[in-house]
Design a protein with these regions (language model features):
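Short alpha-helix in the Rossmann-fold core of NAD(P)-dependent oxidoreductases
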Residues: 47-52, 59, 67, 98-99, ...
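Conserved small/polar residues in nucleotide/adenosyl-binding loops
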Residues: 1
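Glycine-rich "substrate-gating" loop/helix at the edge of Rossmann-like oxidoreductase active sites
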Residues: 92, 123-137, 158-175
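Short-chain dehydrogenase/reductase
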Residues: 45, 91-100, 133-141, 170-171, ...
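Active-site Tyr-X1-5-Lys
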Residues: 61, 77, 92-123, 142-149
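NAD(P)H-binding glycine-rich loop region in Rossmannoid oxidoreductase-like domains
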Residues: 7-47
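C-terminal substrate-binding subdomain of Rossmann-fold SDR/epimerase-dehydratase oxidoreductases
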Residues: 147-278
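Conserved Rossmann-fold NAD(P)-dependent oxidoreductase catalytic core, especially the SDR/UDP-sugar
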Residues: 23-29, 53-94
Length: 278
């Protein structure tokens, strides 16, 4: 990395005009407070709405391409489907609300925008370079480390009509997320909000078995569903990729078993980080 900056230092520099004369082709704005259990609305809006809004206007004013991380959390329970349209959107927590609030802000500006802006609604992303996320790192990362510590992995028990470990998500490998971002970078004529998921949902049990298969042993344990998550938890997600495919993306998505094993091997080797070996 070059010129790494703290997020607050970056925003101070942006507002002070420190980047006004830089040649910038594209900004990938992937950062946010992604803690779905964060209840401080002011903090969440400052980090996920105001911060992103400042980056957006910097890009629009200078006609810089911008890709930013939206979230599948904007669909809530998914009772109305997972299409990129208001009829399907239902924020269940402060994080989801902050993401949806910005998406709607962008929708009002897009007709007048003279440069590309793409919001990607990430589903359950997993893969390398996520160690720093702590409790918000992917479930496969959590399960891998549970096995290393205890030779077992734990999943939630039954809740909302789903059996133990049967809550179902659209798990998408971070390598594929990068491919989607780069596709839009190569197509500056396309703007909008698009789902970024495989279009195929899998149970958490499937991920757990992939981890256990990697190690060749271990126990799968189910724990009571936490009271604090009831009413705020997405039991099912599955991207509707109609608009993504209509935009021309044809890079496909890595099968979950293949990606999970590749990631586990990298966790074995480096703790989950790509290491430059030049």
């Amino acid at each position: 990395y070059k010129r790494q900056m703290d997020k607050y230092a970056f925003m101070d520099a942006l507002k002070a005009g420190k980047f006004n004369h830089e040649k910038i082709d594209v900004i990938f704005h992937e950062g946010a407070c992604s803690d779905t259990m964060e209840y401080n609305g002011k903090y969440m809006m400052e980090n996920n709405f105001e911060y992103t809004k400042n980056v957006l206007h910097f890009c629009l004013d200078r006609k810089i391409q911008m890709m930013y991380a939206s979230s599948a959390s904007t669909y809530g329970s998914g009772a109305h489907g997972f299409r990129e349209e208001p009829a399907c959107e239902e924020a269940l927590n402060v994080y989801a609300f902050s993401k949806l609030f910005f998406d709607n802000y962008l929708r009002r500006l897009l007709p007048q925008a003279q440069s590309q802006v793409v919001g990607l609604r990430y589903f359950n992303v997993y893969g390398p370079q996520e160690n720093h996320k702590g409790k918000m790192a992917s479930m496969i990362y959590q399960m891998y480390n549970q096995w290393k510590a205890e030779h077992k992995v734990r999943l939630f028990g039954e809740y909302a009509g789903y059996g133990p470990g049967e809550h179902t998500r659209d798990f998408v490998y971070v390598k594929d997320v990068v491919k989607v971002n780069f596709y839009f970078w190569d197509h500056p004529e396309i703007s909008g909000i698009f789902n970024c998921g495989t279009g195929h949902a899998h149970q958490f049990n499937t991920l757990a078995k992939a981890v256990l298969n990697h190690f060749g042993s271990g126990e799968l344990e189910y724990v009571p569903f936490p009271e604090v998550l009831k009413g705020k938890y997405q039991s099912f997600t599955e991207a509707d990729d109609t608009n993504l495919l209509a935009a021309g993306y044809d890079g496909g998505f890595t099968p979950i078993e293949e990606a999970a094993e590749e990631y586990c091997q990298l966790l074995d080797k480096t703790g989950g980080y790509y290491v430059y070996e030049g």
